[in-house]
Each structure stands twice: as structure tokens, then as C-alpha cells.
């Protein structure tokens, strides 16, 4: 089945301060330059625009998005 794009209004997304656009994030735990595409939980690092995330298994997240579950690829 085709995955749906995650809504910023989704309850889990809101709990994790998810946003489609990391450039405007003001959250205390945000690190400059962090975004979905360079997160360990973005399960297909080659995905462009929208990709799968292990935190939101039924949805796609924005490549340039961010949430508080962000973990840097190491």
C-alpha cells in the first residue's frame, strides 16, 4: 500500500513537534542543520522529497522536516 504523507496535525507528529520545514524550527533540542534526510530514523536515505521514517511507520515525512526524535547519522 502507498504510504500517506504525515500531517503536522497528526497527534504523534504534534507530540514530537514534527514540522515539514526544519528551517523555521525554534525548539530547544533542535541542532542547526538537522533534518529528516540526515536522521538515522529516516529509513531510506536515498528518498527524495518524502521518505519513510521508523517513528511514523504508516506515513512519509518531508526530507527537509524535523522532529524531536531526530538522531544524527553517525
Curated annotation (Swiss-Prot):
Q: Which SUPFAM superfamilies match?
A: HIPIP (high potential iron protein) (SSF57652)
Which Pfam families does the entry link to? Answer: HIPIP
Key words of the record: 4Fe-4S, Electron transport, Iron, Iron-sulfur, Metal-binding, Transport
Question: Which residues make up the binding site for [4Fe-4S] cluster?
Answer: 36, 39, 53, 67
MF annotations from Gene Ontology: 4 iron, 4 sulfur cluster binding; electron transfer activity; metal ion binding
Family listed: Belongs to the high-potential iron-sulfur protein (HiPIP) family.
Tell me, how does this one assemble? Homodimer.
Task: Identify this protein by name.
Answer: High-potential iron-sulfur protein isozyme 2
Q: Which organism is it from?
A: Ectothiorhodospira mobilis
Amino acid at each position: 500500500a502507498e504510504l500517506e504523507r504525515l500531517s503536522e496535525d497528526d497527534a504523534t507528529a504534534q507530540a514530537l513537534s514534527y514540522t515539514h520545514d526544519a528551517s523555521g524550527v525554534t525548539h530547544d533540542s533542535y541542532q542547526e542543520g538537522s533534518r529528516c534526510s540526515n536522521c538515522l530514523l529516516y529509513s531510506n536515505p536515498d528518498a527524495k522529497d518524502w521518505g519513510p521514517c521508523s517513528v511514523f511507520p504508516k506515513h512519509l515525512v518531508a526530507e527537509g522536516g524535523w522532529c524531536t526524535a531526530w538522531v544524527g547519522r553517525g
